[in-house]
Amino acid sequence: MTHAAIDQALADAYRRFTDANPASQRQFEAQARYMPGANSRSVLFYAPFPLTIARGEGAALWDADGHRYADFIAEYTAGVYGHSAPEIRDAVIEAMQGGINLTGHNLLEGRLARLICERFPQIEQLRFTNSGTEANLMALTAALHFTGRRKIVVFSGGYHGGVLGFGARPSPTTVPFDFLVLPYNDAQTARAQIERHGPEIAVVLVEPMQGASGCIPGQPDFLQALRESATQVGALLVFDEVMTSRLAPHGLANKLGIRSDLTTLGKYIGGGMSFGAFGGRADVMALFDPRTGPLAHSGTFNNNVMTMAAGYAGLTKLFTPEAAGALAERGEALRARLNALCANEGVAMQFTGIGSLMNAHFVQGDVRSSEDLAAVDGRLRQLLFFHLLNEDIYSSPRGFVVLSLPLTDADIDRYVAAIGSFIGGHGALLPRAN
Protein backbone atom coordinates (compact mmCIF):
# COMPACT_ATOMS: atom_id res chain seq x y z
CA MET A 1 0.00 0.00 0.00
CA THR A 2 1.45 3.37 -1.01
CA HIS A 3 0.13 6.87 -0.49
CA ALA A 4 0.48 7.56 -4.22
CA ALA A 5 -1.61 4.52 -5.13
CA ILE A 6 -4.41 5.55 -2.78
CA ASP A 7 -4.29 9.12 -4.09
CA GLN A 8 -4.56 7.83 -7.66
CA ALA A 9 -7.47 5.54 -6.81
CA LEU A 10 -9.28 8.42 -5.14
CA ALA A 11 -8.61 10.75 -8.08
CA ASP A 12 -10.07 8.12 -10.41
CA ALA A 13 -13.13 7.84 -8.16
CA TYR A 14 -13.60 11.62 -8.20
CA ARG A 15 -13.38 11.67 -11.99
CA ARG A 16 -15.94 8.90 -12.45
CA PHE A 17 -18.25 10.58 -9.96
CA THR A 18 -17.98 13.97 -11.70
CA ASP A 19 -18.60 12.47 -15.13
CA ALA A 20 -21.68 10.62 -13.88
CA ASN A 21 -23.33 13.52 -12.05
CA PRO A 22 -23.42 16.71 -14.14
CA ALA A 23 -26.83 17.80 -12.84
CA SER A 24 -25.70 17.55 -9.22
CA GLN A 25 -22.59 19.54 -10.08
CA ARG A 26 -24.65 22.27 -11.74
CA GLN A 27 -26.99 22.40 -8.75
CA PHE A 28 -24.04 22.66 -6.38
CA GLU A 29 -22.42 25.49 -8.33
CA ALA A 30 -25.67 27.46 -8.63
CA GLN A 31 -26.47 27.04 -4.95
CA ALA A 32 -22.98 28.09 -3.86
CA ARG A 33 -23.73 31.58 -5.14
CA TYR A 34 -26.21 32.11 -2.30
CA MET A 35 -25.05 29.64 0.37
CA PRO A 36 -21.45 29.20 1.56
CA GLY A 37 -20.32 25.93 0.08
CA ALA A 38 -23.90 25.46 -1.17
CA ASN A 39 -24.52 24.03 2.27
CA SER A 40 -26.53 24.49 5.46
CA ARG A 41 -25.55 21.17 7.06
CA SER A 42 -21.84 20.40 7.19
CA VAL A 43 -22.11 16.61 7.40
CA LEU A 44 -23.70 16.48 3.93
CA PHE A 45 -20.70 17.96 2.14
CA TYR A 46 -18.00 15.86 0.48
CA ALA A 47 -15.56 16.50 -2.32
CA PRO A 48 -15.66 17.06 -5.22
CA PHE A 49 -19.33 18.04 -4.65
CA PRO A 50 -22.27 16.33 -2.97
CA LEU A 51 -25.09 14.63 -4.79
CA THR A 52 -28.36 16.50 -5.00
CA ILE A 53 -31.11 14.14 -3.92
CA ALA A 54 -34.31 14.75 -5.87
CA ARG A 55 -36.73 12.37 -4.17
CA GLY A 56 -37.13 9.28 -2.03
CA GLU A 57 -39.59 6.43 -1.70
CA GLY A 58 -39.40 3.52 0.71
CA ALA A 59 -35.72 2.68 1.06
CA ALA A 60 -34.77 4.19 -2.31
CA LEU A 61 -33.37 7.58 -3.30
CA TRP A 62 -33.03 9.24 -6.70
CA ASP A 63 -30.49 11.96 -7.42
CA ALA A 64 -30.75 14.91 -9.79
CA ASP A 65 -29.21 12.84 -12.59
CA GLY A 66 -31.78 10.08 -12.22
CA HIS A 67 -29.61 7.47 -10.51
CA ARG A 68 -31.45 5.22 -8.04
CA TYR A 69 -29.80 4.17 -4.78
CA ALA A 70 -30.60 1.87 -1.90
CA ASP A 71 -30.51 4.17 1.14
CA PHE A 72 -28.10 2.91 3.80
CA ILE A 73 -27.70 6.18 5.70
CA ALA A 74 -31.39 6.96 6.42
CA GLU A 75 -30.96 10.62 7.31
CA TYR A 76 -28.21 9.77 9.81
CA THR A 77 -30.69 7.68 11.89
CA ALA A 78 -33.68 10.05 11.67
CA GLY A 79 -35.08 8.17 8.67
CA VAL A 80 -35.94 4.85 10.29
CA TYR A 81 -39.31 4.90 8.51
CA GLY A 82 -37.80 5.33 5.07
CA HIS A 83 -39.24 7.89 2.69
CA SER A 84 -42.89 8.90 2.32
CA ALA A 85 -44.38 6.22 4.58
CA PRO A 86 -48.16 6.46 3.95
CA GLU A 87 -48.99 6.20 7.66
CA ILE A 88 -46.87 9.24 8.46
CA ARG A 89 -47.83 11.21 5.39
CA ASP A 90 -51.53 10.75 6.13
CA ALA A 91 -51.07 11.78 9.78
CA VAL A 92 -49.26 14.96 8.78
CA ILE A 93 -51.88 15.89 6.19
CA GLU A 94 -54.68 15.35 8.70
CA ALA A 95 -52.88 17.52 11.26
CA MET A 96 -52.31 20.29 8.72
CA GLN A 97 -55.97 20.32 7.80
CA GLY A 98 -56.73 21.33 11.38
CA GLY A 99 -54.39 24.31 11.21
CA ILE A 100 -50.61 24.51 11.42
CA ASN A 101 -49.73 27.43 13.72
CA LEU A 102 -52.26 27.27 16.53
CA THR A 103 -50.43 29.38 19.14
CA GLY A 104 -51.48 27.23 22.04
CA HIS A 105 -51.52 23.84 23.66
CA ASN A 106 -52.92 21.41 21.10
CA LEU A 107 -54.70 18.07 21.00
CA LEU A 108 -51.67 16.12 19.79
CA GLU A 109 -48.76 16.91 22.11
CA GLY A 110 -50.07 15.22 25.24
CA ARG A 111 -50.60 11.84 23.62
CA LEU A 112 -47.08 11.82 22.14
CA ALA A 113 -45.59 12.80 25.50
CA ARG A 114 -47.47 9.98 27.22
CA LEU A 115 -46.40 7.48 24.56
CA ILE A 116 -42.73 8.40 24.93
CA CYS A 117 -42.84 8.22 28.73
CA GLU A 118 -44.45 4.79 28.52
CA ARG A 119 -41.94 3.62 25.90
CA PHE A 120 -38.87 4.79 27.84
CA PRO A 121 -39.46 4.05 31.55
CA GLN A 122 -36.65 6.28 32.84
CA ILE A 123 -38.55 9.33 31.53
CA GLU A 124 -41.15 10.41 34.09
CA GLN A 125 -41.81 13.77 32.44
CA LEU A 126 -40.47 15.45 29.31
CA ARG A 127 -40.44 18.61 27.23
CA PHE A 128 -40.25 18.88 23.46
CA THR A 129 -37.61 20.79 21.49
CA ASN A 130 -36.82 21.21 17.81
CA SER A 131 -33.68 19.05 17.71
CA GLY A 132 -31.42 16.77 19.67
CA THR A 133 -28.97 19.65 19.98
CA GLU A 134 -31.57 21.77 21.75
CA ALA A 135 -32.57 18.82 23.93
CA ASN A 136 -29.00 18.37 25.14
CA LEU A 137 -28.56 22.08 25.79
CA MET A 138 -31.74 22.17 27.86
CA ALA A 139 -30.80 19.03 29.79
CA LEU A 140 -27.45 20.59 30.68
CA THR A 141 -29.16 23.82 31.70
CA ALA A 142 -31.51 21.88 33.96
CA ALA A 143 -28.61 20.05 35.59
CA LEU A 144 -26.61 23.23 36.17
CA HIS A 145 -29.57 24.88 37.87
CA PHE A 146 -30.69 21.81 39.82
CA THR A 147 -27.25 21.23 41.34
CA GLY A 148 -26.04 24.83 41.54
CA ARG A 149 -22.71 23.71 40.05
CA ARG A 150 -20.89 24.65 36.84
CA LYS A 151 -18.72 21.79 35.56
CA ILE A 152 -19.92 19.35 32.89
CA VAL A 153 -18.21 16.00 32.28
CA VAL A 154 -18.16 14.88 28.64
CA PHE A 155 -16.07 12.37 26.71
CA SER A 156 -13.56 12.56 23.88
CA GLY A 157 -15.19 11.63 20.61
CA GLY A 158 -18.61 12.60 21.92
CA TYR A 159 -21.13 14.41 19.78
CA HIS A 160 -24.26 15.90 21.29
CA GLY A 161 -25.29 18.27 18.51
CA GLY A 162 -23.99 21.04 16.31
CA VAL A 163 -22.71 23.11 19.24
CA LEU A 164 -21.65 20.24 21.49
CA GLY A 165 -18.87 18.37 19.68
CA PHE A 166 -15.80 16.87 21.37
CA GLY A 167 -13.76 15.36 18.55
CA ALA A 168 -10.00 15.17 18.20
CA ARG A 169 -9.82 18.88 17.41
CA PRO A 170 -11.71 21.37 19.60
CA SER A 171 -14.66 22.85 17.72
CA PRO A 172 -14.90 26.65 17.71
CA THR A 173 -18.69 26.32 17.55
CA THR A 174 -19.00 24.41 20.83
CA VAL A 175 -20.80 26.43 23.50
CA PRO A 176 -18.45 27.83 26.18
CA PHE A 177 -19.54 25.79 29.19
CA ASP A 178 -17.03 24.55 31.78
CA PHE A 179 -16.31 21.13 30.28
CA LEU A 180 -14.13 18.38 31.70
CA VAL A 181 -13.32 16.07 28.77
CA LEU A 182 -12.44 12.50 29.78
CA PRO A 183 -11.51 9.43 27.71
CA TYR A 184 -14.43 7.27 26.61
CA ASN A 185 -14.71 3.72 27.96
CA ASP A 186 -12.08 4.32 30.66
CA ALA A 187 -13.94 3.53 33.87
CA GLN A 188 -10.92 3.95 36.13
CA THR A 189 -10.08 7.44 34.89
CA ALA A 190 -13.73 8.47 34.98
CA ARG A 191 -14.14 7.39 38.59
CA ALA A 192 -10.94 9.14 39.66
CA GLN A 193 -11.65 12.42 37.87
CA ILE A 194 -15.29 12.62 38.93
CA GLU A 195 -14.28 12.01 42.53
CA ARG A 196 -11.49 14.59 42.27
CA HIS A 197 -13.74 17.31 40.86
CA GLY A 198 -16.89 16.12 42.61
CA PRO A 199 -17.98 19.32 44.38
CA GLU A 200 -17.80 21.21 41.06
CA ILE A 201 -19.56 18.68 38.81
CA ALA A 202 -23.18 19.33 37.90
CA VAL A 203 -23.68 16.67 35.28
CA VAL A 204 -22.12 13.80 33.34
CA LEU A 205 -23.26 13.72 29.70
CA VAL A 206 -22.57 10.56 27.68
CA GLU A 207 -23.75 8.58 24.68
CA PRO A 208 -24.34 4.91 25.54
CA MET A 209 -22.82 4.31 22.11
CA GLN A 210 -20.83 7.09 20.47
CA GLY A 211 -22.38 7.65 17.07
CA ALA A 212 -20.44 10.29 15.15
CA SER A 213 -17.10 8.85 16.28
CA GLY A 214 -17.88 5.57 14.61
CA CYS A 215 -20.51 3.54 16.47
CA ILE A 216 -18.33 2.78 19.49
CA PRO A 217 -20.39 0.99 22.14
CA GLY A 218 -20.02 2.11 25.72
CA GLN A 219 -18.83 -0.79 27.85
CA PRO A 220 -21.33 -1.73 30.59
CA ASP A 221 -18.71 -1.38 33.34
CA PHE A 222 -17.85 2.12 32.10
CA LEU A 223 -21.47 3.28 31.97
CA GLN A 224 -22.17 1.73 35.36
CA ALA A 225 -19.12 3.52 36.78
CA LEU A 226 -20.57 6.82 35.55
CA ARG A 227 -23.88 6.06 37.25
CA GLU A 228 -22.21 5.22 40.54
CA SER A 229 -19.75 8.12 40.45
CA ALA A 230 -22.40 10.70 39.56
CA THR A 231 -24.57 9.50 42.43
CA GLN A 232 -21.61 9.55 44.80
CA VAL A 233 -20.77 13.21 44.14
CA GLY A 234 -24.36 14.45 43.78
CA ALA A 235 -24.21 15.09 40.03
CA LEU A 236 -26.84 14.19 37.46
CA LEU A 237 -26.24 11.57 34.78
CA VAL A 238 -27.62 12.37 31.31
CA PHE A 239 -27.78 9.70 28.63
CA ASP A 240 -27.83 11.15 25.14
CA GLU A 241 -30.07 8.64 23.38
CA VAL A 242 -30.75 10.78 20.33
CA MET A 243 -29.29 7.97 18.22
CA THR A 244 -29.31 4.99 20.57
CA SER A 245 -32.95 4.98 21.66
CA ARG A 246 -33.73 3.04 18.48
CA LEU A 247 -31.34 0.19 19.32
CA ALA A 248 -33.68 -1.69 21.65
CA PRO A 249 -37.45 -1.74 22.23
CA HIS A 250 -37.19 0.70 25.16
CA GLY A 251 -33.86 2.37 24.43
CA LEU A 252 -30.28 1.22 24.88
CA ALA A 253 -29.97 2.37 28.49
CA ASN A 254 -33.00 0.31 29.45
CA LYS A 255 -31.50 -2.73 27.75
CA LEU A 256 -28.28 -2.21 29.72
CA GLY A 257 -30.22 -1.82 32.95
CA ILE A 258 -28.67 1.56 33.82
CA ARG A 259 -31.02 4.39 34.77
CA SER A 260 -30.02 7.96 34.02
CA ASP A 261 -31.43 11.05 35.71
CA LEU A 262 -32.22 12.69 32.38
CA THR A 263 -32.43 11.36 28.82
CA THR A 264 -32.29 13.25 25.54
CA LEU A 265 -34.08 12.11 22.40
CA GLY A 266 -34.33 13.23 18.79
CA LYS A 267 -34.04 12.01 15.22
CA TYR A 268 -36.64 9.38 14.27
CA ILE A 269 -39.04 9.92 17.18
CA GLY A 270 -40.55 12.93 15.41
CA GLY A 271 -41.58 10.74 12.49
CA GLY A 272 -39.05 12.40 10.20
CA MET A 273 -39.96 15.95 11.24
CA SER A 274 -37.76 18.30 13.27
CA PHE A 275 -37.80 16.87 16.79
CA GLY A 276 -36.05 16.72 20.11
CA ALA A 277 -37.03 15.98 23.69
CA PHE A 278 -35.43 15.89 27.10
CA GLY A 279 -36.88 14.32 30.19
CA GLY A 280 -36.38 12.11 33.20
CA ARG A 281 -36.82 12.57 36.91
CA ALA A 282 -39.96 14.50 37.78
CA ASP A 283 -38.20 16.55 40.46
CA VAL A 284 -35.68 17.82 37.91
CA MET A 285 -38.27 18.46 35.21
CA ALA A 286 -40.36 20.41 37.73
CA LEU A 287 -37.88 23.24 37.20
CA PHE A 288 -39.72 23.93 33.94
CA ASP A 289 -43.26 23.86 35.34
CA PRO A 290 -44.51 27.40 34.56
CA ARG A 291 -46.80 27.28 37.59
CA THR A 292 -43.99 26.87 40.11
CA GLY A 293 -40.60 26.37 38.43
CA PRO A 294 -37.86 28.95 37.94
CA LEU A 295 -36.76 27.99 34.40
CA ALA A 296 -38.39 29.12 31.18
CA HIS A 297 -38.10 27.07 28.01
CA SER A 298 -39.56 28.45 24.81
CA GLY A 299 -39.58 27.53 21.14
CA THR A 300 -42.19 28.46 18.57
CA PHE A 301 -42.21 25.02 16.97
CA ASN A 302 -41.60 22.81 20.04
CA ASN A 303 -45.13 21.40 19.91
CA ASN A 304 -45.88 21.91 16.22
CA VAL A 305 -48.75 19.74 15.07
CA MET A 306 -46.90 18.13 12.16
CA THR A 307 -44.19 16.69 14.40
CA MET A 308 -46.66 15.70 17.10
CA ALA A 309 -48.79 13.84 14.56
CA ALA A 310 -45.92 12.23 12.67
CA GLY A 311 -44.19 11.11 15.84
CA TYR A 312 -47.30 9.46 17.24
CA ALA A 313 -48.12 7.71 13.98
CA GLY A 314 -44.58 6.44 13.58
CA LEU A 315 -44.25 5.02 17.09
CA THR A 316 -47.70 3.41 17.15
CA LYS A 317 -48.05 2.12 13.59
CA LEU A 318 -44.50 1.44 12.39
CA PHE A 319 -41.63 1.55 14.88
CA THR A 320 -43.31 -0.30 17.71
CA PRO A 321 -41.19 -1.95 20.43
CA GLU A 322 -41.49 -5.20 18.49
CA ALA A 323 -40.33 -3.55 15.28
CA ALA A 324 -37.40 -1.94 17.10
CA GLY A 325 -36.29 -5.32 18.38
CA ALA A 326 -36.61 -6.93 14.97
CA LEU A 327 -34.64 -4.17 13.24
CA ALA A 328 -31.90 -4.47 15.85
CA GLU A 329 -31.69 -8.20 15.17
CA ARG A 330 -31.37 -7.56 11.42
CA GLY A 331 -28.51 -5.19 12.14
CA GLU A 332 -26.72 -7.69 14.36
CA ALA A 333 -27.00 -10.32 11.63
CA LEU A 334 -25.69 -7.92 8.97
CA ARG A 335 -22.73 -6.83 11.08
CA ALA A 336 -21.82 -10.47 11.75
CA ARG A 337 -21.88 -11.20 8.00
CA LEU A 338 -19.73 -8.17 7.21
CA ASN A 339 -17.15 -8.94 9.88
CA ALA A 340 -16.96 -12.57 8.78
CA LEU A 341 -16.40 -11.40 5.20
CA CYS A 342 -13.58 -9.05 6.23
CA ALA A 343 -11.94 -11.76 8.33
CA ASN A 344 -12.15 -14.32 5.53
CA GLU A 345 -10.56 -11.86 3.10
CA GLY A 346 -7.70 -11.17 5.52
CA VAL A 347 -8.13 -7.39 5.59
CA ALA A 348 -7.87 -5.16 8.65
CA MET A 349 -11.42 -3.94 8.26
CA GLN A 350 -14.34 -4.28 10.64
CA PHE A 351 -17.81 -2.98 11.40
CA THR A 352 -18.50 -1.82 14.94
CA GLY A 353 -21.85 -0.91 16.41
CA ILE A 354 -25.03 -2.18 17.99
CA GLY A 355 -28.19 -3.31 16.27
CA SER A 356 -29.25 -1.25 13.28
CA LEU A 357 -26.32 1.22 13.47
CA MET A 358 -22.76 0.34 12.49
CA ASN A 359 -19.58 1.86 11.08
CA ALA A 360 -16.80 0.57 8.84
CA HIS A 361 -13.27 0.93 10.18
CA PHE A 362 -9.96 0.05 8.56
CA VAL A 363 -8.30 -1.15 11.72
CA GLN A 364 -7.69 -4.41 13.55
CA GLY A 365 -8.44 -5.12 17.20
CA ASP A 366 -10.97 -3.75 19.65
CA VAL A 367 -12.28 -0.23 19.08
CA ARG A 368 -13.06 1.22 22.51
CA SER A 369 -12.58 4.93 21.81
CA SER A 370 -11.91 7.38 19.00
CA GLU A 371 -8.22 7.25 19.93
CA ASP A 372 -8.14 3.68 18.59
CA LEU A 373 -9.03 5.09 15.16
CA ALA A 374 -6.53 7.95 15.10
CA ALA A 375 -4.15 6.19 12.70
CA VAL A 376 -6.81 5.13 10.18
CA ASP A 377 -6.29 6.52 6.68
CA GLY A 378 -9.41 8.57 5.98
CA ARG A 379 -8.93 8.21 2.24
CA LEU A 380 -9.94 4.56 2.49
CA ARG A 381 -13.33 5.57 3.85
CA GLN A 382 -13.74 7.89 0.87
CA LEU A 383 -12.84 5.10 -1.53
CA LEU A 384 -15.45 2.90 0.11
CA PHE A 385 -18.07 5.63 -0.16
CA PHE A 386 -17.53 6.18 -3.89
CA HIS A 387 -17.38 2.45 -4.56
CA LEU A 388 -20.75 2.03 -2.88
CA LEU A 389 -22.21 4.84 -4.98
CA ASN A 390 -21.01 2.99 -8.08
CA GLU A 391 -22.89 -0.03 -6.74
CA ASP A 392 -26.05 2.12 -6.37
CA ILE A 393 -25.80 2.29 -2.58
CA TYR A 394 -26.10 5.64 -0.81
CA SER A 395 -24.16 5.72 2.45
CA SER A 396 -21.87 8.05 4.40
CA PRO A 397 -18.33 9.22 3.64
CA ARG A 398 -17.35 8.32 7.21
CA GLY A 399 -18.44 4.69 6.82
CA PHE A 400 -21.65 5.01 8.82
CA VAL A 401 -24.35 2.42 8.03
CA VAL A 402 -27.96 2.91 9.12
CA LEU A 403 -30.78 0.43 8.55
CA SER A 404 -34.36 1.52 8.02
CA LEU A 405 -37.60 -0.44 8.17
CA PRO A 406 -38.26 -0.62 4.40
CA LEU A 407 -34.87 -2.11 3.48
CA THR A 408 -35.35 -5.55 1.97
CA ASP A 409 -33.28 -8.69 2.33
CA ALA A 410 -32.19 -8.13 -1.27
CA ASP A 411 -30.95 -4.64 -0.36
CA ILE A 412 -28.92 -6.06 2.51
CA ASP A 413 -27.50 -8.84 0.33
CA ARG A 414 -26.50 -6.19 -2.20
CA TYR A 415 -24.69 -4.22 0.51
CA VAL A 416 -22.73 -7.30 1.59
CA ALA A 417 -21.84 -8.05 -2.03
CA ALA A 418 -20.68 -4.45 -2.53
CA ILE A 419 -18.34 -4.72 0.45
CA GLY A 420 -16.99 -7.92 -1.05
CA SER A 421 -16.37 -6.29 -4.41
CA PHE A 422 -14.73 -3.32 -2.69
CA ILE A 423 -12.28 -5.62 -0.93
CA GLY A 424 -11.72 -7.52 -4.15
CA GLY A 425 -11.12 -4.40 -6.21
CA HIS A 426 -9.06 -2.43 -3.70
CA GLY A 427 -7.46 -5.20 -1.68
CA ALA A 428 -3.93 -4.09 -2.54
CA LEU A 429 -4.64 -0.69 -0.96
CA LEU A 430 -6.16 -2.01 2.26
CA PRO A 431 -4.26 -2.86 5.44
CA ARG A 432 -3.86 -6.59 5.97
CA ALA A 433 -4.89 -8.45 9.08
CA ASN A 434 -2.07 -9.85 11.19
UniProtKB/Swiss-Prot annotation:
(S)-3-amino-3-phenylpropanoate binds at R41. Transmembrane segments: none annotated. Has high activity over a broad pH range (4 to 11.2). Gene3D superfamilies: Aspartate Aminotransferase, domain 1, Type I PLP-dependent aspartate aminotransferase-like (Major domain). Optimum temperature is 55 degrees Celsius. Displays a 2-fold higher activity at 55 degrees Celsius than at 30 degrees Celsius. It comes from the Bacteria. Pyridoxal 5'-phosphate binds at G132, T133, T300. Binds 1 pyridoxal phosphate per subunit. GO terms for molecular function: pyridoxal phosphate binding; transaminase activity. It is an enzyme of class 2 (transferase). Its cofactor is pyridoxal 5'-phosphate. The modification N6-(pyridoxal phosphate)lysine is found at K267. Is inhibited by 2-aminooxyacetate (AOA), a mimic of beta-alanine and a known inhibitor of aminotransferases. Its EC number is 2.6.1.-. Pfam families: Aminotran_3 (PF00202). Keywords: Aminotransferase, Pyridoxal phosphate, Transferase. It catalyses: (S)-3-amino-3-phenylpropanoate + 2-oxoglutarate = 3-oxo-3-phenylpropanoate + L-glutamate; (S)-3-amino-3-phenylpropanoate + pyruvate = 3-oxo-3-phenylpropanoate + L-alanine. Homodimer. Belongs to the class-III pyridoxal-phosphate-dependent aminotransferase family. This is Beta-phenylalanine transaminase. It comes from Variovorax paradoxus.
